[in-house]
Amino acid sequence: MKILVIGNGGREHALAWKAVQSPLAETVFVAPGNAGTALEPALQNVAISATDVPALLEFARREKIDLTIVGPEAPLVIGIVDAFREAGLAIFGPTQAAAQLEGSKAFTKDFLARHQIPSAEYQNFTEVEPALAYLREKGAPIVIKADGLAAGKGVIVAMTLQEAEDAVQDMLAGNAFGDAGHRIVIEEFLDGEEASFIVMVDGEHVLPMATSQDHKRVGDGDTGPNTGGMGAYSPAPVVTDEIHQRVMDQVIWPTVRGMAAEGNVYTGFLYAGLMIDHTGQPKVIEFNCRFGDPETQPIMLRLQSDLVDLCLAACDGKLDQKTSQWDPRPALGVVLAAGGYPGDYTQGDQIHGLPLEEVADGKVFHAGTRLEEDLVLTNGGRVLCVTALGDDVAAAQKRAYELTKPISWQGSFCRRDIGYRAINRK
């Protein structure tokens, strides 16, 4: 079979790396891919942007692609799944209407309220004055979210009223997030521990993936601004068997059934970003309509099932006939980022010390990289995700940091404490 993976991040490198291990996969293309996918002997990059739907469609038709897996949110929100399905091509992902679960924070909050799915108290605003009045009524800490897509960075957790007012002004009166910020959601600050709960959905049936925990803040000890994610590990010990069942019953099933009831049948990866409080009650912070990045990297390292087989079953509405097998060992991924990220950073720096062959119990997944002649250069803020397995989270952490040691470029940095919550539970 011919498989097409759309995207150019670490998530897509991990999905393509896992897809090509399938006995069903004859060729795996990645559009546009990165240096990591270019250097994988079994993968082929295709120079088409992830959001150029007409060109992707033409390529899929010409190459007779049997299955397309969409990595990032942007093509989903502009309707790539609708376009491929109309052309009779198998594609795993939600339709444009269903992708509103990620594409609009306001849509999601209203949906959660309609279906009594636990979430933070909130209100939507498009005007500065009512938003400021609401802030003053509620006080800080409080959370301000840009309504549209902002690459995982459109959320401000304001610890003071001044920070909150500045965020509202920046988004609604200024242009901090462009069109994405012209409508905002203000919601209560939730206390607890976060977890990423990702499932595969075929419209009716659900197959849970392994749980994981992301590290959003740029600095050690969860300090500094939010990023797209500085590292992750799987599984997340905060999600006990009991909490897992609670999430399925209170969040996942009501979401899948609620979307279907409203005429937006959901297919694809569904990622619930959760806050779990001290009583074990989960609340939805956000939905993403795709796999998380960097959570995909440790999850794919642990997945022992055939990813292509699972995606095909989902496209056929037969996920109820499938189970997923996992390496019992935890996996942990550390993101190496460009100096200055998540603010301004340079690109085009040569990366030194990348492993020349496959490493035991680990994998260096590429994100913001490109190949120029034979040099691997930086091409984004989050550049690599160095991922490893271990007998416990501490061992996986030790192995991942060992693998990062030889790798460097001008200004590169990483958090030194990925996995600390799981390790501190011991």
What feature does the model see in each segment?
Residues 92-154:
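A conserved helix-loop-beta module that forms one wall/lid of the active-site cleft
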Residues 154, 158-296:
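Internal nucleotide-binding/catalytic subdomain
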Residues 21-23, 38-39, 62, 92, ...:
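Solvent-exposed alpha-helices and their adjacent loops that cap or buttress functional pockets
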Residues 369-373, 378-426:
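Generic C-terminus detector
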Residues 45-51, 123-127, 158:
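Short acidic-hydrophobic, aromatic-tinged amphipathic segments that line or gate anion-handling sites
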